[in-house]
Regions:
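Conserved lysine of the Walker
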Residues: 68
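P-loop NTPase motor-domain active sites and their immediate coupling elements
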Residues: 2-37, 41-43, 47-49, 54-55, ...
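Hydrophobic positions on the alpha1 helix immediately C-terminal to the Walker A/P-loop
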Residues: 71, 75
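The conserved Walker
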Residues: 64-65
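Short hydrophobic/aromatic beta-strand immediately N-terminal to the Walker A/P-loop
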Residues: 58-59
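P-loop NTPase switch/communication element
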Residues: 53, 80-125
């Protein structure tokens, strides 16, 4: 590194970061990413994006009113705007029944928004089975990731569907853990 320290000082005048402005900006970075999500802007005003496929585990935490729900909605909307249902499927788990229900009829969903702890646990068990199935498919095709698998089936003209990414969003994870306990914890540990 450098022998320097960077200190961020809050701006006297705040600027609004428009989700629309960033999502409509057709930067080449979007095309390079499997699952691009909008984070915001950096101090120079450049759009900050994240490839969720390269960040398979993401925890959003903060105090009440800090903007966690806004952040989660930005992540989901980024996926909806930039990737088709054939490319990305979603499982949305909302034990408090208030935050994610508005997404109930979107084509990206593998199942309607889940609000019951038992169904949440079952959906994560499905993910575990699907993960094992996909490992087997990748192994059989001699590849290591979804991109290579999808490319290989096209190259070999194999009549099978491409594998979409699956993104699981759990709102209020602590509440879900409190109601389901150790079983859920071990399932999530295996998925991780």
């Amino acid at each position: 590194g450098k022998q320097a320290v960077g200190i961020e000082i809050p701006n006297k005048v705040r600027s609004i970061v428009s989700f629309k402005e960033i999502i409509e900006n057709d930067t080449p970075a979007y095309k390079k990413m499997a699952i691009p999500v909008v984070l915001g802007k950096d101090i120079t005003g450049e759009a900050q994006l994240l490839d969720l496929a390269k960040t398979p585990h993401l925890l959003i935490a903060g105090a009440t009113g800090a903007g966690k729900s806004v952040c989660v909605n930005s992540l989901i909307l980024s996926i909806l705007f930039k990737r088709s249902p054939d490319e990305v499927k979603l499982i949305l788990i909302d034990p408090k029944v208030v935050e994610l229900k508005l997404y109930n009829d979107i084509p990206h969903l593998l199942t309607p928004v889940i609000t019951e702890p038992k169904r949440a646990f079952q959906s994560l068990q499905y993910c575990l089975c699907e993960m094992e199935r996909r490992y087997s498919l990748l192994d059989g095709m001699g590849v290591r990731d979804i991109v290579s698998y999808n490319r290989r089936i096209v190259e070999r003209n194999i009549a099978t569907e491409k594998l979409p990414y699956i993104v699981v969003v759990i709102d209020e994870f602590a509440d879900l853990m409190a109601t389901t306990g150790k079983e859920l914890e071990s399932t999530i540990a295996r998925l991780a």
